[in-house]
From Swiss-Prot:
GO biological process, one term: methylglyoxal catabolic process to D-lactate via S-lactoyl-glutathione
Species name: Dictyostelium discoideum (Social amoeba)
SUPFAM superfamilies reported for this sequence: Metallo-hydrolase/oxidoreductase (SSF56281)
One GO MF term: metal ion binding
Protein's UniProt name: Hydroxyacylglutathione hydrolase
Residues reported in the UniProt entry to bind substrate: 176-178
Binding site for Zn(2+) 1: 56, 58, 112, 137
Length: 268
């Protein structure tokens, strides 16, 4: 299994997940289909996209679905509900599909939108290969999505109980290249003495971007080290909440802390 990021719409990530043995590929959030198809053509002329998997209904993720259906006849377009443009099949939570040797599991993660889903993908022909998680606008490198249709409790559940309980070595492929901005915010919450890993990781990501490289993938282990929204249970993060809410229980609810730092990030 090969994962090829495709930068579209300035800072969106679409992805090709390629089963090279069976010469089949799936596209994740191909909002600019021609760029995604061109990227695959540069890899191989023999591999064809047969399915689209969409994380949520926003135009910069689902907005290419109808177009790709006109380019690739009989393509399957998967999503969670009728708001997902052009879907041909509605998926359910924990539903598993097999395409070639790829096994794709749908995980509900309502928060950014009420029907947002994640896709956990592995290659059955490569049992020792690390799984890959496609998070759309739920989890970003160093951040999380805005709560347009959900609430802090739902985002906490998505980050801690859905994503956070997957194996730490799971690779994370996010929906936007927001990495440096997210890490700059994270650095306002934790000093270098409190989180040396955060500052080292920021420098690494800055160098990657300067060299024309992607910052994806991250990993769940990495996010637990540097992402403030997955560190709400730690004093270095929740002390900011306590300063503004001195009458709160100590330690405070990590859900309340997440909501608080999300409101700070909204204004950052």
């Amino acid at each position: 299994m090969k994962v090829q990021p495709v930068l579209v719409n300035k800072d969106n990530y679409s992805y090709l997940v390629i089963d090279e043995k069976n010469k089949v590929a799936i596209a994740i959030d191909p909002c600019e289909p021609n760029k995604v198809i061109s990227s695959l053509s540069s890899i191989s002329s023999d591999i064809k996209i047969n399915s689209v998997f969409t994380t949520h209904h926003h135009w910069d993720h689902a907005g290419g679905n109808n177009l790709i259906k006109t380019i690739i006849k009989d393509i399957n377009v998967y999503g969670r509900d009728e708001r997902f443009e052009g879907i041909t099949k509605k998926l359910e939570n924990n539903e598993v599909l097999k395409i070639g040797s790829l096994k794709i599991k749908t995980l509900d993660a309502p928060a950014h939108t009420s029907s947002h889903v994640l896709y956990l993908i592995e290659d059955e022909n490569e049992p020792n290969q690390v799984k890959s998680l496609f998070t759309g606008d739920t989890l970003f490198i160093g951040g999380c999505g805005r709560l347009f249709e959900g609430n802090p409790e739902q985002m906490y559940n998505a980050l801690y109980n859905v994503i956070g309980k997957l194996p730490d070595n799971t690779l994370v492929y996010v929906g936007h290249e927001y990495t440096l901005k997210n890490l700059e915010f994270a650095k306002t919450l934790e000093s270098e003495n409190e989180n040396k890993e955060l500052y080292n990781f920021y420098d690494q990501c800055k160098e990657k971007l300067a060299n024309g490289e992607f910052t994806v993938p991250s990993s769940i282990a990495q996010e637990k080290l540097i992402n403030p929204f997955m560190r709400c249970h730690l004093p270095s993060i929740y002390n900011h909440y306590l300063k503004e809410n001195p009458n709160s229980i100590n330690p405070p609810s990590p859900i309340d802390v997440l909501g608080f730092i999300r409101s700070l990030k909204d204004k950052f």
